[in-house]
């Protein structure tokens, strides 16, 4: 036993005595070393903490900054010596090491209480898509949060957790069933959809003091024959995508003049005639239109549909039928089908990496390269959740960052450079987990809820200004914020 301990300590000692030449670099200008800083000779026994101390000394920082280190695009999680050995790299080579700011934990900022489960959330801020597309100036303090609830109502909140506006009930032009998806199209327009099979566009306006507002019915879109699970918006082209349980993807125009007539058999008046029920929405008259196209190819409910982040004429959809499908939206034709091993429940595009992230019923996230030249279905798997992954959003600060919302009651932040080798290939690990604040308030923050009983997350949104906004079964919107958590 003593011999084993001696050999281990000798190995550590030899690693500490061995040296390697490293070139330290950073893509972030405010923490970069001066130009001309050459390679430095360091002991191969150094780990992250010692390297962080070294960089802070080189930068002459009065207040130390915690750093993370990347070699060949992967985070260093061992000593340099162990990394060299594991990767078959000679200590004679000059090792390029990139350093980035370490993760700042996302702190809880606020929670907004609702009367029922919250299925969907979106934001309006100076950095949100709805504002940037419209070139609208949203002043600090004037940010808004949109929520869609199982009670069939939309609510717009200010940052002081006050409800500024609520959508009308069904009798006055509102949804006749639970809302499953809601988004700002522009600062003055909202879109929502849900179990009543309709996509609804609303005009949003506020009083001058900003303390009250109205969400007024503007356009009703009919075409789906079953509930709608998610929505995507591309305001510059006035287009929407919807994912429905009727196995189809809806492609819609937000402009009345562009949209085809609504199918007569799907209008509320037809349903009222056939069942002799009182006509709903009788107190208001709202324009009704149909889809530009219904994309039918999936063989099970469609869970998500999104626009390509760089080309709005391309769409992607995921389904319970295990497939990811690529669509040409100009011709409304199917371009490509990728079949995974499990039902796909959520979808997000990482355009700079040419990857699509798909949340699965099998508790993981699959990163898929949709390009025709890709030879494998899954480029990487992100593991950590203990239940279905039903919502995804990309990090506005970093091309490598992603957040997921799961029925296990947590949101997880991922940096796809944080990986490890596994029997299944390259596997990503989450760098931070956000639990529901309500559990902490009840003194149950550490309770394991694999099924997410009472705290399932249904929706997550990540905004550069507001932070991480999540919503779920606990009837709350929760806001967490951590500035620039991952490097670009």
From Swiss-Prot:
Keywords of the record, alphabetical order, are: Nucleus, Repeat, Ribosome biogenesis, rRNA processing, WD repeat
Task: List GO BP terms, alphabetically.
Answer: chromosome organization; maturation of 5.8S rRNA from tricistronic rRNA transcript (SSU-rRNA, 5.8S rRNA, LSU-rRNA); maturation of LSU-rRNA from tricistronic rRNA transcript (SSU-rRNA, 5.8S rRNA, LSU-rRNA); protein-RNA complex remodeling
Example of a GO cellular component annotation carried by this entry: preribosome, large subunit precursor
Which residue ranges contain the repeat WD?
A: 128-167, 174-212, 223-262, 297-337, 339-378, 384-424, 452-488
Q: Where in the cell is it found?
A: Nucleus, Nucleolus; Nucleus, Nucleoplasm
CDD domains the record matches: WD40
Q: Which Pfam families match?
A: NLE, WD40
Where does the sequence pass through the membrane? Answer: none
| One GO molecular-function entry | ribonucleoprotein complex binding
- Cite the InterPro entries for this sequence: G-protein_beta_WD-40_rep, NLE, WD40/YVTN_repeat-like_dom_sf, WD40_repeat_CS, WD40_repeat_dom_sf, WD40_rpt, WDR12/Ytm1
| Chain residue ranges for the region called Ubiquitin-like (UBL) domain | 20-101
State the family it belongs to.
Belongs to the WD repeat WDR12/YTM1 family.
> Quaternary arrangement and interactors, per the entry?
Component of the NOP7 complex, composed of erb1, nop7 and ytm1. The complex is held together by erb1, which interacts with nop7 via its N-terminal domain and with ytm1 via a high-affinity interaction between the seven-bladed beta-propeller domains of the 2 proteins. The NOP7 complex associates with the 66S pre-ribosome. Interacts (via UBL domain) with mdn1 (via VWFA/MIDAS domain).
Function, please?
Component of the NOP7 complex, which is required for maturation of the 25S and 5.8S ribosomal RNAs and formation of the 60S ribosome.
User: What is the protein's given name?
Assistant: Ribosome biogenesis protein ytm1
Q: Give the species this sequence originates from.
A: Aspergillus clavatus (strain ATCC 1007 / CBS 513.65 / DSM 816 / NCTC 3887 / NRRL 1 / QM 1276 / 107)
- Give the classification, highest ranks: Eukaryota, Fungi, Dikarya, Ascomycota, Pezizomycotina
